[in-house]
Amino acid sequence: MTQLPQPLTPDELQKIDAYWRAANYLSVGQIYLLDNPLLQTPLTLQHIKPRLLGHWGTTPGLNFIYAHLNRIIRRDDLNMIYIAGPGHGGPALVANTYLEGTYSEHYPDISQDIQGMKHLFRQFSFPGGIGSHATPEIPGSIHEGGELGYALSHAFGAVFDNPDLIAACVVGDGEAETGPLATAWHSNKFLNPVHDGAVLPILHLNGYKIANPTILARISREELDQLFQGYGYQPYIVEGEDPLTMHQLMAGTLDQVLAEIRSIQTRARLDGVTQYPRWPMIILRTPKGWTGPATVDGLKTEGSWRSHQVPLSELAKKPEHIQQLEAWLRSYRPEELFDTQGRLVEPLQTLAPLGNRRMGANPHANGGSLMKQLRMPDFRKYAVEIVQPGQIEAESTRIMGSFLRDIMCLNLKTCNFRVFGPDETASNRLGSLYDVTPKTWLAETLPEDEHLAPDGRVMEILSEHTCQGWLEGYLLTGRHGLFSCYEAFIHIVDSMFNQHAKWLKVSKEIPWRRPIASLNYLLTSHVWRQDHNGFSHQDPGFIDHVINKKADTIRIYLPPDANCLLYITDKCLRSRNFVNVIVAGKQPQLQWLDMDAAIKHCTAGIGIWGWASNDQAGEPDVVIACAGDVPTIEVLAAVSILREHLPDLRIRVINVVDLMTLQHDREHPQGLSDREFDTLFTTDKPIIFAYHGYPWLIHRLTYRRTNHANLHVRGYKEEGTTTTPFDMTVLNDMDRFHLVDDVIDRVPHLGYKAAYLRQIMRDKLVEHREYINRHGEDMPEIRDWKWTAP
C-alpha cells in the first residue's frame, strides 16, 4: 500500500482541520441563525431566520482552500490575494476575514465575541445587512462573483506589473463552462514571470451547478488532465472526501506548486524569458456541500446539486429539520473552536497570517490605497492647429494615439499604465503606442511578426471579455488603463460593464474603500463610419445601456474633433471611480475648435458655437444641436445651406460633448438646471437635434424640459449596409439635406419662402442616390465640403 505524503505534523493537521471547521460553522451560522450563535441552548425556530438565503454548496470548498492558503502565506511570508470565482459562496469570505480579524477592524460592531458573532450571522442576506456574494463590503475582495466567468481574467489583471503578488483564483466548475472563463485560461501566454506576479488557478470540481452536473466533473481524469496540459498548465489533482486525508494532500500539493512558482520566477528573473512557462494549477475535487447533511428527507444532499443553496429549507414546517440543523452545526464542535466569550481559541488564532499578509487586509485588494498618479504630458502639445473652423481634416484617434504613446513613455518606470484591445489597437489608429512599447506576447513568434515581445504593455487578445477582465483586475489593484474597441462589439461586455458599475456604486458607499482609476472605454470604428463592414458592425447602443447606471458612476463623451478628444482623454485618465465612455471616429474628418476653444467647450460639456450661429442680435428662429463627430459635420453643412438660401433665418448652433448635461441637474451632477437649459434651447422654439446614437435616448434625457414638445431628434434608426459614409446618414435621415427639410417643416413663418429650398434638398437626395449607385463613392460636393461662413 502506497504511503501518502504527510507534510503536516499531527498538531498542524489538528489545527488546520479545526480552523476549517470554525469557518464552516460560521458559514452555516450566517445562512441560518438569528440568535444563539454558539448553541448555548437547544436550537429552536426562534433562533432561525424566517427567510433562508445563501449558497452552501461551494462554501466548504472555499473555506478549505482559504485555510490552506493561510498556512503557506504565514510560513513563506507570501503576498497573496484570494479571488473566489464562485462568489455566491460569500459566507466563506465573510467567515475567514472574521476569523483573521480584518472584518472586525473594518466593522467594529461585528466584534470577535458572542455579540459580534450574533450580529455577523444576523446581517447576512438580511434587510439592512449584507448581500450573499463576495461583495465590496468584504475586506480582501476584488471580485464579487455574482455573474460567473470573470474570476481568472481578474486574477491575471491583478498580477500584471505586480511581481511579488500571487492571486489564488478559485474557479468553480460551473463557471468553467462560461465562454469568458474558457478563454481566460489563455492569459498564461501574456504573463511575464520577470515583472508580473503569478496566478494560481484552483479549479474546484464539486460536480454540480444549480441543478445539473458540470461537464468537467464528468469527463475522464485523462481528458481533464490533457485539457489543461493543452492550455499550457501543469495540473495537480487533489481529490477525496475524508477531511484528514485531504488536508495532507492539499498541503503537500500547495508546497509543490509554490515551489514551482518560485522556481519559474527565479529562473526568469535571472535568465530572462522568451516564451511562457508551464505554470502549475490545482484541480480540487471535493463533494458539493462537503460536511453538510448527507441526506435530507431521504434524498442525497451532500455530494449532490441539492446542497447548492440551503439544504434544510422547510424548518417551520418540519421540526425534524431543526434537529438536523442543530446536529449539523454541532458536528463542527464549536465548543472546541470558540471560548465562552465567542472568541476563536488562541491556538487557532496563530494559523492566520499577520497584518497586511492576511488576505482580507492585503492592500492590493483595496487598490486605491496603493495607486500612484499617472505622469501625464500636457495634452495641449498635441493640438491640431486650427485657423478657421472646418478647413482641415485629421484622424482624431491618431492624434489621441500620440498622446497615449507619451503617457505610456512617462510611466514605463512605474509600470502602472496599459492599453487593452481585442486586436484593434492599430485599426483604431493608436499605433503610435508601438513607438515606445510592443504588445505583450509569450507564445511562439515568427520572423514576420511585428510589435510582439514578452515585455510589451499593449494587451491584445481577440476576446473583449478577457480584455475587460484584465483591465478591471488591473484597476482594482491600483493601476490605470484604457480599453479601445469597435463600437458595435463593445456590446459583448455589456454585462461585465454592469457588474463593474455596480461594484463602483457600492464601493463609493464604503468609507475604507479607496477610489480607483476609472474604467475608460474608447469606442471607435463607430456606426457612421462602418460603411465598409456593413450592418453587423453598426450599433451605437452601448451608450443607451451605460446610461441606465447610477449618475455618479457613469460619464459619456462625444467629442466632435481631435482637440476636444485630447481634453476628454486627459480628463478621463485623471478621474476616479467612474466608467467613462468616449465615442470618437478614427477616419479623417473636419476639425472645428482650436485648443483654447476646445478646453472651454469641453469644460462646460455643452455650448453655443457662435461662429456657426447668426442669432446674436435676438432670439433664434430655430435651434440646431448636435452630439457626435458625424452629426456635427451634417449639422454644420445643413446650417451653411440654410444661411446661404435663407439669410434672414436666425439659427443657433449647439454642440454637446458631455451627453449627461442634457439631463436635469437633480438627476445627474453634470446636468443643466432648467434655467440653464432653457437659456440654451429656448422655451418655445423648434429644436432639431442630430445625435450619434438612437434618437429616443435624447428624448429620454430631456423629457422633463420645458421645450421638449418642440424637440425633433435625428439619429441612427437601424438602417445600414455596406455603402458610402454619407449614405449612412441619408439612410437614417440624419444627413444635411434631411436636416434642412426638418427646419423648413418646423419653423412656422418659413412656409412658401422655403419651397424652392425644399425642392433643391429633395433633388439632392435623388442626385446622391444616382451618383453613388453609378460611381461607388460620395459626390465631390460631399467629399470635399468645408465650412464657409456666409
Swiss-Prot record:
It comes from Nitrosomonas europaea (strain ATCC 19718 / CIP 103999 / KCTC 2705 / NBRC 14298). Keywords: Lyase, Thiamine pyrophosphate. InterPro entries: Phosphoketolase (IPR023962), THDP-binding (IPR029061), Transketo_C/PFOR_II (IPR009014), Xul5P/Fru6P_PKetolase (IPR005593), Xul5P/Fru6P_PKetolase_C (IPR018969), Xul5P/Fru6P_PKetolase_CS (IPR019790), Xul5P/Fru6P_PKetolase_N (IPR018970), Xul5P/Fru6P_PKetolase_ThDP_BS (IPR019789). Belongs to the XFP family. GO terms for molecular function: aldehyde-lyase activity. The lineage of its organism: Bacteria, Pseudomonadati, Pseudomonadota, Betaproteobacteria, Nitrosomonadales. The keyword Acetylation does not apply. Its cofactor is thiamine diphosphate. This is Probable phosphoketolase. GO terms for biological process: carbohydrate metabolic process.
